[in-house]
Amino acid sequence: MLSLLALAMMQLPQNPSPMTDSTRDHVRVESRAVAGAHHNLSVGTLLVPYGRMATRPLVVHFHGEGNLVETVIHRWRDNAAVISVVAGGGSDVYAAAIGSGEKFRQLLAEGQQKCSCVFRPIYLTSFSAGYGAVREILRDPLSVERVDGVVLADSLHASYETGDKPGPVVPADLDSLFDFAKLAAEGSKRMLVTHSEVFPGTFASTTETADYLLTQLHLKRKAIMRWGALGMQQLSEAHLGNFHLLGFAGNTAPDHLDHFHAIYDWLKKL
């Protein structure tokens, strides 16, 4: 767990937060071995649950401990194939790991060969720095055609136009994510974005990038007070077509990690 927490918070240098939280439960999903065949791929590891299926849902997840990723996703569907990619800390590391949309499409072909099945639907999920890979994949139109939905679990950051001081976000850092959000809002794709209140200080927080997406989509948040998965406290939401944005309380590392453990719930809401 500590190793995942360390990976989760390692991106660009950020201002350390002294904040702690003892209000919310921060329930954790316990990692377990998921029954199935594991295959090492050119990027990441593929889990194919036992039992033959001609068509099988696939989740490609970026950033998190492999067994725990599989456990969390199988709370959503226990027949789903899972490709888990753990590349280290920092969005640039994940962008480099996937490299390009072409490499992603090759990864899908490699996985389908191992599975002896067709992957459908195909969902991308990321936590924390993992968004770097998702952003690169969605910059490739042919890969966008293959991807049915995206979940960003407290996992969308950008640089500031003012460098390491708070200011406007760099639009180019969010270009492909915004384009996919538009497709989801129009109904042809599905997208769910969650964010905490963690404020890194030296690069745009998930709240600031969420606000950017909402502005570009001409959407406004609705303030709410609702219990979420695993004891999380939801404070806001916005919906348009198949695009969903959920805002949650919390500015501590455990609050950030909540979003990873709740990925099964985000997939249900997708």
Region locations from a protein language model:
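Active-site machinery of serine-nucleophile hydrolases
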Residues: 53-115, 231-235
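Glycine-rich nucleophile elbow surrounding the catalytic serine of serine-hydrolase chemistry
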Residues: 126-137
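The feature captures the conserved acid-bearing segment of alpha/beta-hydrolase catalytic domains
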Residues: 151-254
